Amino acid sequence: GIALVSTVMNFQTIRFADNNDLPLVLILPSYTATAWYHKKLPPAMQSKSIAQVVDEGRKFAANEYAPAMLRIDSLSPAERNTLAERYSSLTGLSKDFVERNNFRVDLGEFNKELLRSERRTTGRLDSRFKGIDRDAAGDGPDSDPSMNAIRPPYTAAFNSYVRGDLGFKSDVEYYILGGGITTPWNWNTNNAYADTSIPLKDAMAKNPYMKIFLAQGYYDMATPFYAAEYTVSAMNLDPSLRRNITFDYYEAGHMMYIDTKSLAKLKRDATAFIQNAVARAER
């Protein structure tokens, strides 16, 4: 089987661009989760659980927002007003801000705007984190506060482990993220978005016993959970193969294992996935 943690397979689902509205729809439930966490939703929504809240976001994204974006410039004034009110109530953003952005609020704009009145920003890897920018008037955050908080201790811990515990030394630069890691990647795509769901579908068809486990954080804005759900639902799998896919969700971000409760849940979920896969294989 395969375990996918905080995954993106189809990069069209997360690349904000002038000619690509899909990420706007697929990240909306994550906006809802983030607004709920920071207590920016109406009282009726704040009283719901995180699972209930994101389900409201899913329904709006699929049944109202996505159809509206197909004809956004031809909506009547009344339709635009209704859409703006619903969008605002599910994201914590003002109706005026949503309308001024023509309903296209990308991640940077959301991270800057949600807590602007508090002169704070929200994180990309984990939207529970708050950041402080040089000024509160920009269009996007200066940096990712969750990355700023997570990266230094992980770097220090790994350096201590490799040099201290293992006694390994090298003058070769070690990349924590990006740089020398991502630059040479070959996605085997030309003039198209990278999409690994296609080879995954082929692999599942060739091996119908293969199981897939997807672990997604509600507050992960880098690889939103609804984008992963959409990708899986669009793989055009045979019905007999769909039952081989398991989703589990965590009240954390991209690196859900930094949260103690989510780490324990991830271990339980992964253990159950492996045990279930082995049990089926032995039948």
Predicted features and spans:
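Catalytic histidine-centered segment of alpha/beta-hydrolase-like enzymes
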Residues: 251-263
